[in-house]
Design a protein with these regions (language model features):
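A structural signal for small-residue-enriched, beta-sheet-centric alpha/beta enzyme cores
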Residues: 1-88, 97-408
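Generic structural marker for isolated residues within well-ordered, non-membrane alpha-helices
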Residues: 93
Length: 408
């Protein structure tokens, strides 16, 4: 059974973290370092955007099966920076390796922030040196790392669980994530930004990468704040095996626990979308294929009209059906059922392709359901057995303001 506990990336055995101010940002913490006492099996998902940031290019090329440290800077994405950007990413790895006595190949690197600006490596080098001396474990270390990777995020995004595996081994999983804008990840293994670090003391092999892809596809890859996939999206799972026990690649208890952590992180990213006031959850069932279910979910959560309606608690369900029709997926309108859920209210809207209600009083009930911090849109296509769930947020005035003023 998965047990949620108070913790973050240093909760599993053997992990230490630091977050410091290097000067890339004016005041905030802006450089983070994660370290494992032993080399850890690394499973990594990267953005599938064709315009990839320098750190993503470097890590994809190296494709290391083991990592012992990850260095992250915020305030500068190191994207669209040409050869110099590649050299800067490599230098971040090298400086970190020298400070910790590691091989640079066992150091991961991530960046987030403004695109198209060169790194101030004097400040970054200073930050890495300082962070390497401040590595420790515990909640303050987790909090410092979480703060150091934030950009337009308004909250730290952390999660930790413990679970007993099938062989009796007690293992821990910790996670930290950032993401608020430019969020519509489509991360692939071996292929405003979502960066996530997941740590575990479970024993995993490099073959777990295939399962890691499936978990990403059902969690972070089902999040969309604005439909824009970042140049820097990266998600790193580190498993150092310090809990002992058998290889947990095929352990259903571990898979369930990791999937729980990633789903929780995904929901938190969506809820903290830039300017957001509401979390939107979209569940599609009865689809003919998995691809159709996923496409339908993404079409709904990416629709500016749907997002605006949720913001205003406007029961204009025609916008949801418009989005369904625009998805390109085939279905019979006569089979579709639509329900909106908010708080303890679950209101049928459409049945067999026709509205369940027409009177003003019923419309007000729908409005009340939508006037909650979390609104669920439930769509049953009635044609198959495939399902998908995704998360987004409402579109507010503040989203436009934040992005209009971002670089200033």
């Amino acid at each position: 059974m998965v047990e949620v506990i108070d913790g973050g990336v240093t909760t599993p055995q053997g992990f230490k973290a630091a977050g410091v101010h290097s000067g890339v940002k004016y005041r905030s913490l802006d450089l983070a370092l994660l370290y494992s006492e032993t080399p850890a099996t690394a499973c990594v998902g990267y953005t599938s955007n064709n315009v990839k940031a320098a750190p993503v290019q470097v890590m994809m090329k190296e494709n290391a099966e083991k990592l012992q440290a990850v260095v992250i800077n915020s305030g500068n994405a190191n994207a669209l920076t040409g050869r110099r950007g590649i050299e800067d990413a490599l230098e971040m790895k090298k400086v970190t390796a020298n400070e910790l006595g590691l091989d640079p190949l066992n150091v991961g690197v991530m960046s987030t922030g403004l695109i198209g600006r060169f790194m101030d490596m004097h400040k970054v080098r200073y930050g890495i040196s300082r962070a390497s001396r401040e590595l420790f474990n515990g909640r303050q270390a987790d909090a410092n790392l979480a703060e150091a990777i934030m950009t337009t995020d308004t909250i730290k995004k952390e999660c930790a669980v413990r679970v007993r595996l099938s062989d009796g081994t007690l293992v821990y999983i910790g996670a930290i994530c950032k993401g608020s804008g430019m969020i519509s990840p489509h991360m692939k293994v071996l292929h405003g930004t979502t960066l996530s670090l997941i740590t575990t003391d479970a024993n995993l092999s490099p073959a777990f990468r295939e399962k890691w892809q499936r978990i990403l596809d059902g969690s972070l890859n089902m999040v969309s704040v604005d439909g824009d996939q970042s140049t820097n999206d990266t998600s790193i799972l580190l498993a150092n095996g310090m809990a002992g026990g058998k290889v947990a690649d095929d352990d259903p208890e571990f898979y369930e626990a990791l999937n729980f952590v990633m789903t929780k992180i995904a929901r938190t990213v969506a809820a903290d979308g830039e300017g957001a006031t509401k979390l939107i959850e979209v569940k599609v069932s009865g689809a003919d294929t998995k691809d159709d279910a996923v496409k339908l979910v993404k079409t709904i959560i990416n629709s500016p009209l749907v997002k605006s309606a949720i913001f205003g608690s406007d029961p204009n369900y025609g916008r949801i059906m418009m989005a369904l029709g625009n998805s390109g997926c085939k279905f019979n309108l006569e089979d579709v059922r639509l329900t909106i859920k908010g708080g303890d209210m679950e209101v049928p809207i459409l049945d067999s392709g026709a509205p369940v209600f027409q009177d003003e009083r019923s419309v007000e009930v729908v409005r009340m359901a939508m006037d909650n911090k979390e609104v669920s849109i439930l769509v049953d296509l009635g044609v198959g057995n495939e399902t998908a769930t995704g998360w987004g947020c409402d579109l507010t005035y503040d989203y436009v303001r934040i992005n209009a003023e971002y670089s200033t």
